[in-house]
């Protein structure tokens, strides 16, 4: 009975993560309270893998009848539809806050504003354009290269973003609250399971590309931690979204520059 309960609990956590990050339907029996959401971080990478697979499938089918650039764009649209633009919205809010605010309080206040500012619009447009161009270049090399890019980037970017909650403080609009650090409610097992999904997709790449991508993402994670601390003293949900977007671009860049799937 205990093994069955554990299996059902893990399945529940995966569906909680899926429901949080995507607009995909989840079973009605799923329990999605705050505690389950915090524990579901272990499966954020697997949700990224699922999103990457959906984008890859859309690209694979459309590239057989449509030009490469159009097929890539449709795959990107599919990704936005699946997630509801969840991470893109957070990236825009972060850009508005970090670039438009002068003080700690100003940055957080701007980030909480639902209106899109000029900084957010510019950064979002550049990220989307760069993502499209990089994926087109991968697709022109071979369809398999683009498929690999979708799967690897969507998975690893969410692993990196989720890993930040284990080492950076959570920030509210008033002060740093030690008791609200999500990492206090998570264990090393959560981190190991999260990282395992990232290691799994690295096997889609050849040895050199996998090694360089691992080192590059580790360095990016270090820089993001320092940058978030310098800007607002920690992280918010929006900054995690920004981390996901930036690290996704990093994945495409490394795969294109260093090497493609074996």
From Swiss-Prot:
Requisite cofactors: Mg(2+)
Transmembrane segments: 11-31, 43-63, 66-86, 121-141, 146-166, 199-219
Keyword terms of this UniProt record: Cell inner membrane, Cell membrane, Cobalamin biosynthesis, Magnesium, Membrane, Transferase, Transmembrane, Transmembrane helix
Source domain of life: Bacteria
Function: Joins adenosylcobinamide-GDP and alpha-ribazole to generate adenosylcobalamin (Ado-cobalamin). Also synthesizes adenosylcobalamin 5'-phosphate from adenosylcobinamide-GDP and alpha-ribazole 5'-phosphate.
NCBIfam families reported for this sequence: cobS, PRK00235.1-3
Protein known as: Adenosylcobinamide-GDP ribazoletransferase
Biological source species: Shewanella denitrificans (strain OS217 / ATCC BAA-1090 / DSM 15013)
Gene that encodes the chain: cobS
């Amino acid at each position: 009975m205990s093994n069955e309960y554990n299996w059902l609990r893990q399945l529940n956590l995966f569906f909680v993560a899926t429901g949080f990050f995507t607009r995909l339907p989840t079973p009605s029996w799923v329990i999605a309270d705050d505690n389950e959401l915090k524990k579901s971080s272990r499966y954020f990478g697997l949700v990224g893998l699922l999103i990457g697979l959906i984008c890859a499938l859309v690209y694979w089918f459309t590239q057989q009848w449509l030009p490469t650039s159009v097929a890539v764009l449709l795959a990107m649209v599919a990704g936005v539809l699946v997630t509801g633009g969840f991470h893109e919205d957070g990236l825009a809010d972060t850009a508005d806050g970090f670039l438009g605010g002068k003080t700690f309080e100003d940055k957080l206040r701007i980030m909480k504003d639902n209106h899109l500012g000029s900084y957010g619009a510019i950064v979002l447009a550049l990220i989307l354009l760069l993502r499209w161009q990089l994926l087109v270049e991968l697709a022109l090399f071979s369809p398999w290269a683009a498929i690999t890019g979708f799967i690897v980037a969507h998975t690893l970017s969410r692993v990196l973003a989720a890993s930040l909650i284990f080492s950076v403080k959570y920030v509210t609009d008033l002060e740093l609250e030690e008791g609200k650090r999500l990492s206090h409610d998570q264990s090393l097992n959560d981190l190991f399971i999260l990282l395992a999904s990232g290691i799994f997709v690295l096997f889609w790449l050849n040895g050199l590309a996998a090694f360089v991508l691992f080192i590059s993402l580790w360095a990016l994670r270090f820089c993001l931690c320092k940058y978030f601390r310098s800007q607002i003293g920690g992280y918010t949900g929006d900054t995690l979204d920004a981390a996901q977007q930036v690290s996704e671009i990093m994945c495409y860049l490394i795969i294109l520059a260093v090497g493609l799937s074996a």
